[in-house]
Structures are given as structure tokens and as C-alpha cells.
From Swiss-Prot:
This is Oxygen-independent coproporphyrinogen III oxidase. It is found in: Cytoplasm. GO terms for cellular component: cytoplasm. Belongs to the anaerobic coproporphyrinogen-III oxidase family. Disruption phenotype: Cells lacking this gene accumulate coproporphyrinogen-III both under aerobic and anaerobic conditions, however they do not exhibit any obvious growth defects. The hemN hemF double mutant do not abolish aerobic and anaerobic respiratory growth. Its cofactor is [4Fe-4S] cluster. It comes from Pseudomonas aeruginosa (strain ATCC 15692 / DSM 22644 / CIP 104116 / JCM 14847 / LMG 12228 / 1C / PRS 101 / PAO1). PANTHER family: COPROPORPHYRINIGEN III OXIDASE (PTHR13932), OXYGEN-INDEPENDENT COPROPORPHYRINOGEN III OXIDASE (PTHR13932:SF6). Binds 1 [4Fe-4S] cluster. The cluster is coordinated with 3 cysteines and an exchangeable S-adenosyl-L-methionine. Induction: By the redox response regulator Anr under aerobic and anaerobic conditions and by Dnr only under anaerobic conditions.
């Protein structure tokens, strides 16, 4: 399952479509306002009855500085006092949620994201973790996967020591690019030394895993400059790497309007960056997990992919997909059984709801039977690059070929083009098709607009 990916420029040009990242199916685009707090409470009670383990996501939206490329839900402020009122509401949300869960439900996974979680003071971080431990069953023996996103400019050795003391054992560091011209163009000045210091601290303090985030396609980047950044990152030997494609959508994300579109690399240059990056990482011993993610062979993600247990949810690739995911904080998304739900993305609305003693769920959806079938298919393909029809047929009581009869001509074209191997038993994505797994999964997405589906069929 972990063969080296093969670069096929012709296939990539033909199948390089815009499409979902499939951290869920159906995707968040399908969320509607018919889902509210009552649905969330009902799902939490069902989770309690089933005794499901938990994965928690905690959103801290504050950033001291704006990065022009960013599309996250965030509050830009240098006023550290703004976090206190937010934390009071976050604790209130934790209290409400915990009433509908059981102390028997172990929190196997915890992730603090943002924003910049280390925007919080040491005292606030201690208090937040104390409240989580008071109301929910966090593990005390370091066996859980407890991670936090870190801006190396907002952390030092003492920060890393505190976080380790509080129970965090995984860190994800934002790097994006080490080139100074690129950093100036996106308003994120960060020296390699700042990143190296945090990596060294994480190793010394025995964090289990270090992830670094890179972005290709940023203004002022060139294939050569990005290759130098990748070399510098490889020298740091992170356990995992995320290499994201920058999507320039200034009409949707206001900070991106500060980026000069003339400074963006061409599509051809972006493809060259991706090709060289995959080659550099492969030469350095990294495995391609899928969807922009790479890991060392002894990392848990690589091991899970090899033994067939890797999963994917709103936290990305995970070994805890069996957990019910509970999102806490403004804009946070939960996945509890067949319910997807999302908190208000407006911080004032979020806080007002909790002041009134109510959860701030504003949108979401319930998966139907067809969603569950397609979710299982997409999950298997995106995590393992192969699908046994018998597994889906046994789980859902269907005949795979009959159920997806209208897709068969497209699957046969994929096979003829070399993206997949298709036979009576299943689908195997080839080494040439793995970089295009998103395009393959799009075929099974019944919610894609018909225009996109037609475009998807015509590119062959």
C-alpha cells in the first residue's frame, strides 16, 4: 500500500480539478441551518449510551498578527485581554457538553487549533486544561494523542515545557516557507532559527510527534526557492509534513486581497514545486500518506496505513476515526455518529448563546443511508488507495456494481488512463493516480454540482 508515488504530468494536467478535501462526507458545503443545539444534545446522549471514546477539538481563534494567505476563522488582535471573555464562554460550553457525556468515555485524542492557541497566557492554558480534566475523562498516562498547533514566533522553551507538563505530546508548527521574500509578501516573518528552537525543545522534552506545515503557491515563490525550504525542513527531521496548495480566493477571504496576484507562481511552476517536493521527501525517506501529507515510516500514520486502520475526519488523517469528535469553540465542527454540526462562526453570536445557557450550534446535517455508503467508499480510497467491493457489500447489504452502475463507465475510463486498476473484486489506485485521489473520490460524491460532474467526465 505504501509504494512510491509516480509523477505523470499528463495525468495530472487532465485530472487536476478543484474539489473537496474530504475531511468529511458529505462535506461542510452541504451543512444547512436545520441543525441546532437540540440535535447536538441528542447525539451526545447517544454517544454516552454507546460508550464511544472521544476526540476533542478546541478552537482558539486569536492571532496577534495577520498572515495574508490565511483562510482560518480568526480574530486579529494584540490585546491579550480579549481572550479572557472567550475562555469564560468556552468553559461554559465544556460544562454543558459534559453533562450529556459520561466519565467512562475516554478522551483518546485532543487537539488545540486556531488561530494561535499559544496566544493564551500560561495561566489561561493551565485553567483551560484543568477545566477539561474536571469535566471530561482526559488520560493522565501520556497514552492519548494530545496535540497543539504552535506558531514558533509565539513560543519558546518555557512554553514547550508548560505544554508538555499539561499533557500535550504532539505539536504542529506553522512554517509555510523559509524564504524571506515570500515571508514579506505574506506578512509572516519567521526565521529558521525560531522554528529550529521549537523543534529542538520538542525533541528534548520528548514530544511523541512533530509536524511541520508548508504551503506551495505563495507569492514570490519559485521552484528553486521552495526546494531550498524543503531541504531546510528535511534537515529538521519532523515526523510528519503537511504540504498544502495555496488557493487564492480573495473574494472569499479578505486578508488574501493584500496579496499581489502578479506575484503568484504560475500553475506550471506550482506543479514543478509539488513534483520536486515529492521527490525530495521520497529521497529523504518520507512516505506519502495522501492528500498533501507525508510521514516517516515509523510514524503512527504510516503504520496505520500499512495495517489498514488509517482513517480521516475533520482533524485530518487520524488513528482515532472510531472516536466521536466533539468540537468546542467558535466555528468548531463536531462529528458524532451520523451527525455533523458546527458552532457559530461569529464570536459574538457564539458568546451570546453560551451566556443564555445554550450551545451555539448553527448548522450541520444528518447522514442518510446513501451518505454512509459513499462515506465508507471515499474514506477507504483516500486513506488506503484501494477498495474491496466485498467489504462495502457486507457492511451495507448492497451489490457494489449495481449500486454504482452509473459510475462504471467513468471507472473504466480511469482504469484505461492508468489512474486505477479495476476488476471484479475492487479498485486499486495506481502509483500514478495517488496524487489524484481527490479527483477519484469526487466521482462518488453525489453532491457535486452537475456542472462540475460534467467537467469531471469531459477531462478524459
Amino acid at each position: 500500500m505504501l509504494d512510491t508515488i509516480r509523477w505523470d504530468a499528463d495525468l495530472i494536467r487532465r485530472y487536476d480539478l478543484s474539489g473537496p478535501r474530504y475531511t468529511s462526507y458529505p462535506t461542510a458545503v452541504q451543512f444547512h441551518e436545520g441543525i441546532g443545539p437540540f440535535d447536538q444534545l441528542h447525539a451526545l446522549r447517544d454517544s454516552r449510551k454507546a460508550g464511544h471514546p472521544l476526540s476533542l477539538y478546541v478552537h482558539i481563534p486569536f492571532c496577534a498578527n495577520i498572515c495574508y494567505y490565511c483562510a482560518c476563522n480568526k480574530v486579529i488582535t494584540k490585546d491579550r485581554g480579549r481572550s479572557a471573555p472567550y475562555l469564560a464562554r468556552l468553559v461554559r460550553e465544556i460544562e454543558i457538553v459534559s453533562r450529556h457525556l459520561s466519565r467512562e468515555q475516554v478522551v483518546e485524542q485532543l487537539h488545540f487549533g486556531g488561530g494561535t492557541p499559544t496566544f493564551l497566557s500560561p495561566g489561561q492554558l493551565r485553567e483551560l486544561m484543568s477545566q477539561l480534566r474536571t469535566h471530561l475523562n482526559l488520560l493522565d498516562d501520556d497514552s492519548g494523542d494530545y496535540g497543539i498547533e504552535i506558531d514558533p514566533r509565539e513560543a519558546d522553551w518555557s512554553t514547550m515545557g508548560l505544554l508538555r507538563e499539561l499533557g500535550f505530546n504532539r505539536v504542529s508548527l506553522g512554517v509555510q516557507d523559509f524564504d524571506m521574500e515570500v515571508q514579506k509578501a505574506v506578512n509572516r516573518m519567521q526565521t529558521p532559527e525560531e522554528t529550529r528552537t521549537i523543534v529542538e525543545a520538542a525533541r528534548t522534552l520528548q514530544y511523541r510527534s512533530i509536524n511541520l506545515d508548508l504551503i506551495y503557491g505563495l507569492p514570490k515563490q519559485t521552484p528553486d526557492s521552495f526546494a531550498r525550504t524543503v531541504d531546510e525542513v528535511i534537515a529538521l527531521q519532523p515526523d510528519r509534513l503537511s504540504v498544502f496548495n495555496y488557493a487564492h480566493l480573495p473574494e472569499r477571504f479578505m486578508p488574501q486581497r493584500r496579496i499581489n496576484a502578479d506575484d503568484l507562481p504560475s500553475p506550471g511552476q506550482k506543479l514543478e514545486m509539488l513534483q520536486r517536493t515529492t521527490e525530495q521527501l521520497a529521497a529523504a525517506g518520507y512516505r506519502y500518506i495522501g492528500m498533501d501529507h507525508f510521514a516517516l515510516p515509523d510514524d503512527e500514520l504510516a503504520s496505520a496505513q500499512e495495517d489498514g486502520t488509517l482513517q480521516r475526519n475533520f482533524q485530518g488523517y487520524t488513528t482515532h476515526g472510531h472516536c466521536d469528535l466533539v468540537g468546542l469553540g467558535v466555528s468548531a465542527i463536531s462529528q458524532i455518529g451520523d451527525l455533523y454540526s458546527q458552532n457559530s462562526s461569529d464570536i459574538n453570536d457564539y458568546q451570546t448563546s453560551l451566556d443564555n445557557g445554550q450551545l451555539a450550534i448553527r448548522r450541520g446535517l444528518h447522514c442518510n443511508s446513501d451518505d454512509r455508503v459513499r462515506r465508507a467508499v471515499i474514506q477507504q480510497l483516500i486513506c488506503h488507495f484501494e477498495l474491496a467491493f466485498e467489504d462495502i457489500e457486507t457492511e451495507f447489504g448492497i451489490d457494489f456494481r449495481s449500486y454504482f452502475a452509473e459510475l462504471w463507465p467513468d471507472l473504466e475510463r480511469f482504469a484505461a488512463d492508468g489512474l486505477i486498476r479495476l476488476d471484479a473484486k475492487g479498485i486499486d489506485i495506481t502509483s500514478s493516480g495517488r496524487l489524484l485521489v481527490r479527483s477519484i473520490c469526487m466521482l462518488f460524491d453525489r453532491y457535486l454540482p452537475s456542472l462540475n460532474r460534467q467537467r469531471f467526465s469531459r477531462v478524459i
